[in-house]
């Protein structure tokens, strides 16, 4: 079963955004729902706030298990998720466990936009099969050297500012951030 699930995840990861048969989506959604229940869901509202700010919660764990209004994905500039089979990045996990609908919706967003998503901006989509309601997609900096430029140092802050603004535009939703 583990090797079959790994094969399915690999195929989901490499598949380009193309329409899917309703029958396939029904089976995929049932599988992802069963997997979500097996892994367990963490209720974001039940996590204790930090001592410094009652609005802030720090949690180490799998963001794809978190029931929250919105989770933030450190995405690539195409917003299509990671295409590397079973890669360990957060982008791969979010796109895998949300289901293949997420890649399709992101592709529609990007086609309508007409260009790659700039670093430090954000877009909101449904979370589909994740326990959260929305996914906020933001693109962090790519630092090919060990020494980031001054602009690259500022870019994560832009992501952290743009994500709540994007969520507020969709709905005033509390956010769960991954590291960007």
Positions of predicted regions on the chain:
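Macrodomain-like recognition of ADP-ribose-binding/processing modules
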Residues: 1-180
């Amino acid at each position: 079963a583990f090797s079959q699930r790994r094969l399915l995840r690999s195929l989901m990861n490499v598949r380009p955004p193309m329409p899917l048969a309703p029958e396939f989506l029904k089976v995929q959604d049932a599988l992802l729902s069963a997997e979500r229940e097996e892994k367990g869901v963490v209720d974001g509202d039940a996590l204790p706030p930090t001592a410094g700010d009652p609005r802030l919660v720090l949690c180490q764990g799998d963001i794809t298990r978190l029931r929250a209004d919105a989770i933030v994905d450190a995405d690539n500039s195409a917003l299509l998720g990671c295409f590397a089979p079973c890669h360990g990045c957060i982008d791969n996990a979010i796109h895998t466990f949300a289901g293949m609908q997420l890649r399709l919706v992101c592709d529609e967003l990007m086609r309508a936009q007409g260009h790659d998503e700039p670093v430090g901006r954000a877009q909101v989509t449904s979370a589909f099969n994740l326990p959260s309601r929305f996914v906020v997609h933001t693109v962090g900096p790519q630092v090919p050297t060990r020494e980031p430029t001054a602009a690259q140092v500022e870019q994560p802050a832009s992501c952290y500012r743009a994500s709540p603004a994007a969520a507020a535009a969709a709905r005033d939703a509390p956010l769960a951030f991954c590291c960007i």
